[in-house]
Curated annotation (Swiss-Prot):
Encoding gene, per UniProt annotation: rplD
Alphabetized SUPFAM superfamilies for the sequence: Ribosomal protein L4
Binding partners and assembly: Part of the 50S ribosomal subunit.
A Pfam family annotated for this UniProt entry: Ribosomal_L4
GO MF assignments: rRNA binding; structural constituent of ribosome
Signal peptide: none
Protein task: One of the primary rRNA binding proteins, this protein initially binds near the 5'-end of the 23S rRNA. It is important during the early stages of 50S assembly. It makes multiple contacts with different domains of the 23S rRNA in the assembled 50S subunit and ribosome. Forms part of the polypeptide exit tunnel.
Organism: Magnetococcus marinus (strain ATCC BAA-1437 / JCM 17883 / MC-1)
Record's keyword annotation contains Disulfide bond: no
GO cellular component: ribonucleoprotein complex; ribosome
GO biological process: translation
Region (Disordered): 54-74
Protein name (Swiss-Prot/TrEMBL): Large ribosomal subunit protein uL4
UniProt record similarity statement: Belongs to the universal ribosomal protein uL4 family.
UniProt keyword terms in alphabetical order: Ribonucleoprotein, Ribosomal protein, RNA-binding, rRNA-binding
Length: 207
């Protein structure tokens, strides 16, 4: 088991807790992390880039001028790609960029990303995360006290309006519940601030 300190809102250690090695103590595998990040980013791509091809451009049903006798190159339609208003050759079309990644691989990649944070001392476990009111200033002060003011992924067991709205306008801070934890955001943000309740929930979900 991995022992980590549990901090309070004043960054004081109140106790220590054990982390499940099957979730937070995995061997670091860059290949799994790369596959998971590519999988996530590919799913986010809209793939809406589209141009009109030769068969999509309006007009051009009539031969623009006679075949012989004009001195011009022979043409059959003004929709041909050599014309200014013609269709585009091999242009981008609407497509789906997402691809499959096995569920076991996704789970192992998430365990690996959590292990990266735990092993590099970029994870701060707090006993609880509560705000009396919706105040961005209070949230900034809390993160600064915990040493996580620059780039933070904040994970709680259940989202509350006070936490979400207080962190919404702080640059480089993202809030998620246990179901929203993912490989890309774990690697993207420098610090992981997570409540002890959320740690237990992740262990139940991923162990």
């Amino acid at each position: 088991m991995i022992q980590v300190p549990v901090k309070d809102a004043n960054n004081q250690e109140v106790r220590s807790t054990e982390l499940n090695e099957s979730v937070f103590g995995r061997e670091i595998r860059a290949d799994l992390l790369g596959m998971a990040v590519n999988y996530q980013l590919a799913k986010r791509r809209l793939g809406t880039a589209t141009v009109l091809g030769r068969s999509d451009v309006r007009g051009g049903g009539k031969k623009p001028y006679r075949q012989k006798g004009t001195g011009n190159a022979r043409q059959g339609t003004i929709r041909a790609p050599q014309f200014r208003t013609g269709g585009i050759v091999f242009g981008p079309q609407q497509r789906d960029y997402s691809h499959k990644l096995n569920k076991k691989v996704r789970k192992l990649a998430l365990q690996t990303a959590l292990s990266v944070k735990a092993s590099s001392e970029e994870m701060v476990v707090v006993d609880k995360l509560e705000l009396a009111s919706i105040k961005t200033k209070e949230m900034k002060a809390l993160l600064s006290t915990l040493g996580a003011a620059r780039s933070t992924f904040l994970v709680v067991k259940e989202l509350s309006n006070e936490i979400v709205l207080s962190a919404r306008n702080i640059p480089n801070v993202m809030v998620a519940d246990v179901d929203g934890v993912n490989v890309y955001d774990l690697l993207r943000y420098e610090k992981l601030v997570i409540t002890e309740e959320a740690v237990r929930s992740l262990e139940e979900k991923l162990a």
